[in-house]
């Protein structure tokens, strides 16, 4: 493929935009460098870049484009909203309708508040949990990404009995000292940390199904034990369902897994592609939020008509019968094909899949936590990524990210992708 225009555009972008990208995850730094491909148009399961190259898209904007690009029902809703004015700064009927839809989908949401991003949703659930409990410390699992607010950009300390350290310049050590990080899927270290710090902990942040060091499911009984131990300590359980809500099941991971949190943070998928976030939970906890309670949160763009209309339309599409079964069927087909190609070409991989999302790790180890995900071959993934790009298959430029299927992918797309994987694996095998 020819990437001349993408390369020229990136060179120009470097003159005007920090690093040439508006989110570091779009950079090709983690896959060997080079100019990231600039896309010009998306439709269904496909992208076309500025050079005219066509791709089957498995990035799906890091998950939220579950209905495919430019879905006609969602596009029509956005267009209608735009014609009526995109921002009022007042209550609307749309926000009430959308809140009711979210509550019907996720029974753990007694009350809901809309915001503008997943980062904002998580940030506010932390504030609400602190207000409700009167405590300050937060727990999280290593490797799980909860946005870019200071409190969640914290890496693990040297063990479960030590506090965190800043994971970004500009995050004060004093903030990191309010965060305890423990490994995912490990009850013993969670218990040890709660034994030491539990009386100071306001809440634990949980990705019920991990999506930020690949797709990693909780071990059987793990989430139930998290609820039990955290509640025994008098703290709250916050589910970050920014990736998982409406991705694996209409009612989110909490419905799929049958475990109920106290608070839930939402984003991405629920907006149908427009900027959005939301948080909600038990009535007595949510009533800590202004104007009813002392926990302040506000936003001019929150609940704007365009995002509300897009979100309503997205959920209407996702209510279609058989939609999630189709995603699971295509995911299983893709998984089987990739594993067969890996065996054929003697390429060592571990593949984690849940329904319509999967991650290919270049390792033979089982991936159940962040340490295992880190100990995979990033250089091999970078080569694989570039080979797949040449084949017209668009993936996320990171070994930690997932492949996301949409409702618009077809069996023919999957068949082509498997063939492309085979050619990429053959090239990798030839250069071992």
Swiss-Prot record:
Major location (coarse): cytoplasm
Recorded family membership: Belongs to the class-III pyridoxal-phosphate-dependent aminotransferase family. HemL subfamily.
Name this polypeptide is given: Glutamate-1-semialdehyde 2,1-aminomutase 1
First-tier enzyme category under EC: isomerase
Cited PROSITE patterns: AA_TRANSFER_CLASS_3
UniProt keywords, alphabetically: Cytoplasm, Isomerase, Porphyrin biosynthesis, Pyridoxal phosphate
Location relative to the cell: Cytoplasm
GO cellular component, one term: cytoplasm
N6-(pyridoxal phosphate)lysine modification, residue list: 268
Alphabetical GO biological process terms: protoporphyrinogen IX biosynthetic process
Subunit structure: Homodimer.
Pathway: Porphyrin-containing compound metabolism; protoporphyrin-IX biosynthesis; 5-aminolevulinate from L-glutamyl-tRNA(Glu): step 2/2
GO molecular function, one term: glutamate-1-semialdehyde 2,1-aminomutase activity
Enzyme Commission number(s): 5.4.3.8
Obligatory cofactor(s): pyridoxal 5'-phosphate
Superkingdom field: Bacteria
Matching HAMAP family: HemL_aminotrans_3 (MF_00375)
Organism expressing this protein natively: Bacillus cereus (strain ATCC 14579 / DSM 31 / CCUG 7414 / JCM 2152 / NBRC 15305 / NCIMB 9373 / NCTC 2599 / NRRL B-3711)
The organism's taxonomic lineage, starting at the top: Bacteria, Bacillati, Bacillota, Bacilli, Bacillales
UniProt keyword Isomerase present: yes
Pfam families noted in UniProt: Aminotran_3
Reactions listed under catalytic activity: (S)-4-amino-5-oxopentanoate = 5-aminolevulinate
């Amino acid at each position: 493929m020819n990437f001349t225009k993408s390369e020229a555009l990136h060179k120009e972008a470097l003159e005007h935009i920090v690093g040439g990208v508006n989110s570091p995850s779009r950079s090709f730094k983690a896959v060997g460098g080079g100019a990231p491909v600039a896309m010009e148009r998306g439709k269904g399961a496909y992208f076309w870049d500025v050079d005219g190259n066509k791709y089957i898209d498995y990035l799906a904007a890091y998950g939220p484009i579950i209905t495919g690009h430019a879905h006609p029902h969602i596009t029509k809703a956005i267009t209608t909203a735009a014609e009526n004015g995109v921002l009022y700064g007042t209550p609307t009927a749309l926000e009430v309708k959308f809140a009711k839809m979210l509550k019907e989908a996720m029974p753990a949401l007694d009350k809901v508040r809309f915001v503008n991003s997943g980062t904002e949703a998580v940030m506010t659930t932390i504030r609400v949990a602190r207000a409700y409990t009167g405590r300050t410390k937060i727990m999280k699992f290593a490797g799980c990404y909860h946005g870019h607010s200071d409190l969640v950009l914290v890496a693990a300390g040297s063990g479960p009995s030590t506090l965190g350290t800043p994971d970004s310049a500009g995050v004060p050590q004093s903030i990191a000292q309010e965060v305890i990080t423990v490994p995912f899927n490990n009850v013993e270290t969670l218990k040890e940390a709660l034994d030491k710090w539990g009386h100071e902990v306001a809440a634990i942040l949980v990705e019920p199904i991990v999506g930020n060091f690949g797709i990693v499911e909780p071990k059987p009984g793990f989430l139930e034990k998290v609820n039990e131990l955290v509640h025994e300590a008098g703290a709250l359980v916050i589910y970050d369902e920014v990736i998982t809500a409406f991705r694996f099941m209409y009612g989110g991971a909490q419905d799929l897994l049958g475990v109920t949190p106290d608070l839930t943070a939402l984003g991405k998928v629920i907006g149908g592609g427009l900027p959005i976030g939301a948080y909600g939970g038990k009535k007595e906890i949510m009533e800590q939020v202004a104007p009813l309670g002392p926990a302040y949160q506000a936003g001019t763009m929150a609940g704007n008509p365009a995002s509300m209309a897009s979100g309503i339309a997205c959920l209407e599409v996702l209510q279609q019968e058989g939609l999630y079964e189709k995603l699971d069927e295509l995911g299983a087909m893709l998984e089987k094909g990739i594993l067969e190609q890996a065996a054929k070409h003697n390429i060592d991989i571990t593949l984690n899949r849940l329904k319509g999302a999967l991650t290919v790790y270049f390792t033979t180890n089982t991936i159940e936590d962040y340490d295992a995900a880190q100990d995979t071959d990033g250089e091999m993934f970078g080569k694989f990524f570039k080979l797949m790009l040449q084949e017209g298959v668009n993936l996320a430029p990171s070994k930690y990210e997932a492949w996301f299927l949409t409702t618009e992918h077809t069996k023919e797309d999957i068949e082509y992708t498997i063939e492309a994987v085979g050619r990429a694996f053959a090239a990798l095998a030839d250069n071992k």
